[in-house]
Amino acid sequence: MKKKAQIRKKMKLALKTFDFSDRQKQTQAIIDQFLISDIYQQAQAIAIFMPMSFEFDVTRLLNDTSKRIVIPKTLPQRKMIFTDYDEDALFLTPFGVRESKSDFAVIPDLIIVPGLAWTEDGYRVGYGGGYYDRYLADFTGQTASFVYDFQILPTIERNKFDIPVRHIFKV
């Protein structure tokens, strides 16, 4: 079983070098799958991460006017809240991630959880900050991830804080 640091390094490289045409095809197929899913249909407030250039492109969902779209905002002590998405009220963090200037917390019905690798049963390797696992420890709503075919691994090293994602959307 590979260590999480090795997986992070390998997957970041794989994402950065992923063929553009294949990326677009898989992204389209996965988003289409998600949009017809029950968890999407039933959710009113959906938390969507703000993708970095090599991450899964969820920006198509940011303009969904049929749902309340919220985005993560990091806080001290590796905590996180979700705030309403407003394109005109974003700033760039020192980590290169766009976040809202607002501090008004919204609890979503569904969280789209980012990551670098997953198992079939929803365990994931994130970026190592633990923000999502801390938030998900007390979260009772639905969780989902969008995963390219090469990001599924047979096993991933786990610790007691790891929270599996409930729904994996992949091609």
Describe the predicted segments one by one:
Residues K2, V106-L110, E120-Y123, R134-V171:
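Surface-exposed, charge/polar-rich loops and edge strands
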Residues S53, P76, A117, Y148-Q151:
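Short, glycine/serine-rich, charged loops/turns that create anion-binding
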Residues N63, G126-Y131:
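Charged helix-capping and loop-helix junction motifs
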Residues M1-K101, V106:
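N-terminal active-site beta-alpha-beta segment that forms phosphate/nucleotide-binding
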